[in-house]
């Protein structure tokens, strides 16, 4: 689930549905526990990159971190196969960071999550094997291959040496990759097929565990069926026809790849050291430092394009003076929104109002305390409290975050 601020609530809904399905299939009291225990999936749950890059946050960082670590602790006990977080460099890169910053800021955020979990009383090997990562695949082929190799090496060292993790699974950087949406151009959109293919190949040769390839027309519109199918076929051809998946780390040993890997590790480690000196990722974000670094890199990248110091084919060179085609307009079906609103009103009217009120009061009490919030969230959704109502209670307790003003 690509969800962050309300990630704990959405996970609670999944668990509630699993329990309901278990009850429907069996009267065995232990069936609910077994089914919940066997749930598999991933919730993105990476709130720090929202403050740093994307902006879809609600609560202040310290309260958001509490929700993240509560998910870690709950899943360790009740859903041990669930991937509790997908720590995301993708959005950081899309906001304009460099490859080095993508690695550094992603791993700095990961360090903050691990430290938060340890401070909450968890043992590192109880939750670290379920941490997952999400990276961008950008245009510089060799740099991208080296980036993944450097990140994997750095994470193993961080977990083994900094956090004293003993389980080799805790050292593993398991990651998903998506080709860079910000690299797609509205001009000559068919060129994006080539860009996406090269980016996908870099991620595969860098060792990604899973991959999303963008549609070539996504700079213009939601992808058409043709574009989505071609994106899928790109992956299938790479996987089945060209042999790159037959060898682990196929570019390992290359002089330039090893040099770039070492250089990215060195420079990213220096950035992490600086973030540590500021008090960690949360402090760096609250000070606006991480955001400012990304903004500066984004400005520099765009300036290079405008000065033709960085060539983008079809944009600032090799143009054909063609008019940019407009994409097909996405039309919102207002009937869908109307029906959902009516369903919500009906739901609220038929539920037990006293029970709902009691559950919301209990949620407020738990949120103000220090006990794990997940059992209460599950009870709330099972009792008919809506996502919006849960959010309202948590806003009342935690407040809403206002970022620092940067000039």
Language-model features and meaning:
Residues 62-66, 166, 180-188, 354-367:
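A short, flexible low-complexity segment enriched in Lys/Arg and Gly/Pro that occurs
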Residues 7, 61-64, 103, 227, ...:
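Generic alpha-helical segment signature
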Residues 88, 104-113, 120, 129-314:
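Active-site capping/gating regions of soluble enzymes
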Residues 225, 233-236, 240-407:
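Flexible, glycine-rich loop/tail regions that form catalytic "lids" or insertion modules at the edges
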Residues 9, 150, 192-195, 229, ...:
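Charged, alpha-helix-enriched surfaces in structured cytosolic catalytic cores
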Residues 2-3, 59-60, 102, 186-189, ...:
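A generic structural signal for short
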Residues 1-138, 143, 162, 169-176, ...:
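Catalytic alpha/beta active-site cores
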Residues 16-19, 23-24, 29-34, 69-81, ...:
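Generic secondary-structure signature for well-ordered alpha-helical cores
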